[in-house]
């Protein structure tokens, strides 16, 4: 729901305004009702008593809005849904208006208005709650200074020009409000408008459209008219107004009756009747004020659009079950299904916009900039597009005081100067390549593009504020408008439609437009080359403008590109050209050179204009200089039958060298502000691109066409100048296509990765996005000749083809087939990044029943408001930020409260100079009400060779884990052995829950992390021995142990059943980072982890002591234990019965009476647990639920990846350069080199 409070000032008294308002409404109803699709019917207008506001006038109207709704959206709706009913209660100076449409149950508008004799200074007229006030946007409408739409301006309605002949008032100057406040009269209409449209993919866009076009635009014009028509109403009384209203009602009834009789027949009468049948439970959120939210075509379309659609749609139900299925009933069924989908799947899961945060205190930004969705009006006159880059849309991350007005567009850049800071606070710049939907027929409206970017910006802030607080204020968005290259193709294909000659609605309701052909035709045009050059120039302009702005001064962060369907194609080719145009291009390899000719038949084989002036291609023979320089960028995919050496510029960027895939950072002259006619020598991006996100782009089809017309072309050779490409799409999107099968054909058998739903997994579900992990999981597809010894399960992927010698003793598993191994290496080398490329987004199944021609608009709108998309992007960008630290730095993602200080001891700086931190803190479990004590040890070096003695350590606790805010609890000094004990003050004792703890060394900001778990008495727990119950291979030699099949599922079953998970291991605590990272790598559920205190000869004794302390001091009730035969005695000492002790592995005869051996493995055991799940429910006292999550969610760790094996063919030097991988995000970076008991090796 979008809530705005409008303040409308007028220089008149309240009594005058009452007459002016009612006169204006009835006059606009007369003038702007033209009949079917645009008009107003007044069904009732009578006084009431004891209603809203006391006694007043009740009005019931029907708005006809069909002609004011975009054609693609109109195709989704039956005619009955194009009528909106309005009920208003006017108890002046209080009014209330409600718009209803039973057909669209999850759409509602509600407006409350107070008319007060002041200047609009009252901050909370409507007594809103704190959450509502944070969500509310205050917008002051100035009838003089605010601009009206170009097609609506009339000189006689301009307050700057109007002077009343009867009252002598006017004209009004720009400072009229200040003058009226001093001299009077002055009044203010406070209008609280609530708009809700809870349908997937359209929520944010339509809610904002209703506010900006249906409410604000209508109210601005209506109040300008009310002022400028004062000579007509100044002498009227309320009795005269009522008489005019009755006359208007009769006139409108006659006009609509004629129209209905001539076109619709009796169906038009249904709306009026159905209004009395409207269900009282229909959602009625709000929008513009009833009386003013005018009746006319301007008002009604917008307001009407916001209003609701007549319940006469129910009449189609009978026709659906009567004789045949009509198009109207099909439309009803589609919308009902999309609404029903939302109900069945729970609204929190179904609606992808960030609406769900309305009740949170810290969710809503304090400032939300206004924007206009003018693209929803088909015939709206938009100003000519200005060459160059429009006013940038900046993410509203810097809050303002509550109630402050959102800045006007003209004030946006001026205000930016106030945001100057000493250092650039922006760490990631997003450049949005926005071209529009492939079905856009016009030149593209800049305001519409800015509206989409503002929607994305709002979604960014909402998600960032809740789950990525470290990124708040460090992200900026800029719009790069791209040419609508598909417009000409759409016009051409529309003319070829079998129904192009038919003007009725049949052609709109049928899917006769081949959507897949549009991008293919567009990229084959002779003008496509210029479009790519224009995109490069505008992108460079946007980047340069950002650097010149106060926000971008000193910017040195990463630049990310986001491209919509068409913008993604243009951006991809721009990146490919940038990769080949830069100095030292990889295109110098002969391998990348391809023969080609023009795709367009009218132009013969010519030189690629994008390659003009670029002499780094290393062709075998020079190209003739006499060849003309005109050629389309897309035509580079054609073979040259004459065998000429015309090289495919885009394809020529790929080589077999091991050079890193990154854009050249060499400087180049800035692009000109005007879009060039053709690419120049400097037609490349001026900056390095870290990631490129595609939103439903048909890029795969375009590349497939180039591959088809040029069989010798290898798509993988089109190396875009970015580090990673992410192809996001909905499975039902008819415009989207995959990319991975073009790079590796066998990926057609591998499903795209599913982007986790934000409502369930805001920080991700722990699934690995790495290409190497996918190749490992699906190794059977790529290593067919290799015998796999360990089955691949959802929780355990065999690493057979990475380390053939570790599978077993069989000779077949010693080495992999050379051909298949080289294929895997080839895929890794040719891939566009190190992660998967194709990602599938959630969409309702009901969308498959919608007309195909309506889906491109719907899906294009859905990306900008999708919290799933925003959270996914933030996870990738923030993850990208963390590995950029140097090896001696810590991956801290927050700013500690205290800056670095000098060491307390002078020797400390010398002792730790060449060693890496290996701090660790023990997970602590305490019973509620008992003292809470945290313990940590601060050491440096792989074997704890240096002890941090006598230094300050700050203790931070995340008291609200979802908030991401670290609270400083205190400071302690380490003792002579590097240990620290910190008792939590009693006044700050924490309640039941799991709390992350971070202990930060004041001197260098390295830190240790652990969890403080507070439980109630009698909490039931399950214990797992890591080495005894999880590992399927011995890890003494330093290899990464495999996970037993089904182990993760068993642990997750116990956690889902409500038990506390406890992990124990006999490994020394110096290996904590590696063990927890291993658990994270395999998605084990979060739990308490216990280690031995240093190296010990009796680890079982320490295990037993730890578990005994849990039972005696914490009062845990351990109900089951898993481990190896060595752990039987430990569990027996705890009092566990044989039926509660589960041992994995071969049965030992002497222990058969003391435990249960799981000889059939975890998979069979899990089936037994699930079959008797009712008997495993916790029987303890009721308690607050502890967090249920995976280690991989809290700490996406990938520094355990076996890069030494994955990259073996690339040579040891590159492995050394790239390092062992990425450190865990919530674990201190450790480079432990233990002599024994290692989980992984580091080269």
Curated annotation (Swiss-Prot):
Residues 259-330, 581-679, 1206-1243 are annotated as: Disordered. One of its GO terms (biological process) is protein transport. The modification Phosphoserine is found at residues 300, 304, 319, 326, 329, 342, 345-346, 373, 382, 593, 600, 621, 895, 1236. The keyword Iron does not apply. Keywords: Calcium, Cytoplasm, Endoplasmic reticulum, Golgi apparatus, Lipid droplet, Membrane, Metal-binding, Methylation, Phosphoprotein, Protein transport, Transport. Disulfide bonds: none annotated. Residues 299-319, 581-593 have a biased composition (Low complexity). Its main location: cytoplasm. GO terms for cellular component: cell body; cleavage furrow; cytosol; endoplasmic reticulum membrane; Golgi cisterna membrane; lipid droplet; midbody. The keyword Methyltransferase does not apply. It comes from the Eukaryota. SMART domains: DDHD, LNS2. GO terms for molecular function: calcium ion binding; phosphatidic acid binding; phosphatidylcholine binding; phosphatidylinositol binding; phosphatidylinositol transfer activity; phospholipid binding; receptor tyrosine kinase binding. Belongs to the PtdIns transfer protein family. PI transfer class IIA subfamily. This is Membrane-associated phosphatidylinositol transfer protein 1. The lineage of its organism: Eukaryota, Metazoa, Chordata, Craniata, Vertebrata.
């Amino acid at each position: 729901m979008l809530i705005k409070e409008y303040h409308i000032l007028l220089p008149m008294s309240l009594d005058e305004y009452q007459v002016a308002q009612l006169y204006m409404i009835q006059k606009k109803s007369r003038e702007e009702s033209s009949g079917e699709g645009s008009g107003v019917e007044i069904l009732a207008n009578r006084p009431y008593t004891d209603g809203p506001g006391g006694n007043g006038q009740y009005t019931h109207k029907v708005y006809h809005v069909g002609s004011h709704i975009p054609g693609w959206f109109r195709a989704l709706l039956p005619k009955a849904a194009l009528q909106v009913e309005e009920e208003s209660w006017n108890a002046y100076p209080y009014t209330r208006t409600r718009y209803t449409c039973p057909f669209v149950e999850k759409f509602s508008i509600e407006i409350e208005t107070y008319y007060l004799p002041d200047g609009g200074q009252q901050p909370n007229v409507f007594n809103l709650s704190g959450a509502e006030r944070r969500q509310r946007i205050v917008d002051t409408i100035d009838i003089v200074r605010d601009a009206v739409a170009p097609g609506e301006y009339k000189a006689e309605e301009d307050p700057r020009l109007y002077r009343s002949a009867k009252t002598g008032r006017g004209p009004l100057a720009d400072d009229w409000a200040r003058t009226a406040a001093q001299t009077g009269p002055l009044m203010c209409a406070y209008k609280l408008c609530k708009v809700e449209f809870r349908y997937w993919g359209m929520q944010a866009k339509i809610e904002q459209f209703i506010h900006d076009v249906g409410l604000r635009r209508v109210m601005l014009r209506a109040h300008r008219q009310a002022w400028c028509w004062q000579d007509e109403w100044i002498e009227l009384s309320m009795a005269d107004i009522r008489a005019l209203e009755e006359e208007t009602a009769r006139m409108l009834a006659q006009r609509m009756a004629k129209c209905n009789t001539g076109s619709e027949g009796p169906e038009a009468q249904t709306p009026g009747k159905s209004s009395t049948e409207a269900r009282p439970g229909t959602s009625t959120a709000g929008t513009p004020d009833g009386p003013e939210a005018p009746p006319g075509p301007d008002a009604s379309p917008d307001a009407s659009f916001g209003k609701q659609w007549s319940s006469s749609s129910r009449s189609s139900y009978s026709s659906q079950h009567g004789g045949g299925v009509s198009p109207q009933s099909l439309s009803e069924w589609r919308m009902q299904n999309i609404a029903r989908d939302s109900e069945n799947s729970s609204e929190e899961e179904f609606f992808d916009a960030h609406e769900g945060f309305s009740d949170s205190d810290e969710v809503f930004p304090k400032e939300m900039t206004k924007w206009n969705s003018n693209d929803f009006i088909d015939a709206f006159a938009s100003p000519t597009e200005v060459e160059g880059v429009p006013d940038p849309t900046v993410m509203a991350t810097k809050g303002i005081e509550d109630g402050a007005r959102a800045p006007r567009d003209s004030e946006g850049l001026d205000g930016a100067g106030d945001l100057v800071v000493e250092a650039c606070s922006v760490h990631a710049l997003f450049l949005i390549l926005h071209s529009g939907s492939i079905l856009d027929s016009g030149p593209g409206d800049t305001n519409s593009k800015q509206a989409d970017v503002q929607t994305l910006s709002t979604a960014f802030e909402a998600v960032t504020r809740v789950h990525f607080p470290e990124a708040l204020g460090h992200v900026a968005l800029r719009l790069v408008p791209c040419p609508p290259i598909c417009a000409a193709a759409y016009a051409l294909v529309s003319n070829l439609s079998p129904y192009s000659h038919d003007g009725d609605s049949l052609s709109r309701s049928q899917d006769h437009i081949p959507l897949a052909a549009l991008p293919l035709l567009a990229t084959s045009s002779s003008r496509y080359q210029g479009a790519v050059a224009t995109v490069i120039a505008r992108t460079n302009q946007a980047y340069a403008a950002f650097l010149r702005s106060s926000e971008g001064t000193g910017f040195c962060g990463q630049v990310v590109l986001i491209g919509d369907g068409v913008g993604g194609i243009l951006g991809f080719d721009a990146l490919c050209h940038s990769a080949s145009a830069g100095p030292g291009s990889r295109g110098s390899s002969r391998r990348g050179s391809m023969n080609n000719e023009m795709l367009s038949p009218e132009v013969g084989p010519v030189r690629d204009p994008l390659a003009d002036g670029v002499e780094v291609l290393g062709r075998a023979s020079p190209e003739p200089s006499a060849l003309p320089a005109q050629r389309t960028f897309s035509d580079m995919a054609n073979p040259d039958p004459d065998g000429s050496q015309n090289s495919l510029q885009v394809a020529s960027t790929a080589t077999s060298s091991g050079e890193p895939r990154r854009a050249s950072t060499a400087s180049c002259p800035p692009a000109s502000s005007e879009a060039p006619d053709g690419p120049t020598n400097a037609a490349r991006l001026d900056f390095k691109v870290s990631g490129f996100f595609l939103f439903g782009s048909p890029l795969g089809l375009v590349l497939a066409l180039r591959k088809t017309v040029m069989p010798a072309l290898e798509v993988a050779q089109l190396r875009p100048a970015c580090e990673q490409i992410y192809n996001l799409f909905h499975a039902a999107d008819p415009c989207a296509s995959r990319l991975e099968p073009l790079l590796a054909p066998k990926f057609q058998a591998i499903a795209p990765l599913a982007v986790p739903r934000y409502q369930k997994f805001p920080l991700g579900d722990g699934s690995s996005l790495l290409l190497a992990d996918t190749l490992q999981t699906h190794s059977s597809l790529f290593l067919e000749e290799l015998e796999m010894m360990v089955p691949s399960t959802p929780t355990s992927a065999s690493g057979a083809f990475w380390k053939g010698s570790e599978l077993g003793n069989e000779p077949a598993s010693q080495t992999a087939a050379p051909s298949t191994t080289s294929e895997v290496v080839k895929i890794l080398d040719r891939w566009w990044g190190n992660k998967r490329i194709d990602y599938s987004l959630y969409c309702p199944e009901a969308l498959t029943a919608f007309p195909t021609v309506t889906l491109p608009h719907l899906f294009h709108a859905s990306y900008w408001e999708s919290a799933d998309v925003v959270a996914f992007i933030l996870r990738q960008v923030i993850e990208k930020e963390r590995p950029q630290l140097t090896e001696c730095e810590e991956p801290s993602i927050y700013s500690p409260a205290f800056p670095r200080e000098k060491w307390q001891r002078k020797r400390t700086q010398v002792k730790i100079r060449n060693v890496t931190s290996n701090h660790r803190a023990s997970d602590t479990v305490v019973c509620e009400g008992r003292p809470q004590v945290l313990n940590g040890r601060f050491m440096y070096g792989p074997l704890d060779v240096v002890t941090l003695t006598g230094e300050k350590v700050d203790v931070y606790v995340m008291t609200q884990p979802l908030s991401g805010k670290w609270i400083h609890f205190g400071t302690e000094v380490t003792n002579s052995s590097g240990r620290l004990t910190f008792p939590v003050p009693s006044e700050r004792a924490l309640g039941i829950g799991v709390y992350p703890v971070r202990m930060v060394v004041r001197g260098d900001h390295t830190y240790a992390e652990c969890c403080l778990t507070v439980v109630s008495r009698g909490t039931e727990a399950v214990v797992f021995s890591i080495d005894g119950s999880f590992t399927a291979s011995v890890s003494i030699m330093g290899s990464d142990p495999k996970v037993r099949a089904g182990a993760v599922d068993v642990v997750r079953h116990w956690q889902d059943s409500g038990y506390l998970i406890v992990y124990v291991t006999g490994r020394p605590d110096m290996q904590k980072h590696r063990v927890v990272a291993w658990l994270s790598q395999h998605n084990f559920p979060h739990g308490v982890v216990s280690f031995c205190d240093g190296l010990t000869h009796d680890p079982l004794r320490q295990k037993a002591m730890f578990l005994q302390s849990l039972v005696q001091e914490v009062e845990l009730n351990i109900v089951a234990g898993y481990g190896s035969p060595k752990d039987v005695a430990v569990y027996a000492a705890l009092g566990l019965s044989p039926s509660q002790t589960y041992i994995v592995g071969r049965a030992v005869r002497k222990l058969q009476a003391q435990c249960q051996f799981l000889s059939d493995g975890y998979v069979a055991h899990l089936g037994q647990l699930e079959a008797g799940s009712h008997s495993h429910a916790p029987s303890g006292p009721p308690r607050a639920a502890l967090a249920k999550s995976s280690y991989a969610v809290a700490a996406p760790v990938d520094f355990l990846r076996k890069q030494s094996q994955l990259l073996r063919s690339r040579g040891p030097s590159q492995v050394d350069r790239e390092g062992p991988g990425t450190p865990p995000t919530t674990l201190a970076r450790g480079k432990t080199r233990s002599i024994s008991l290692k989980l992984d090796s580091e080269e």
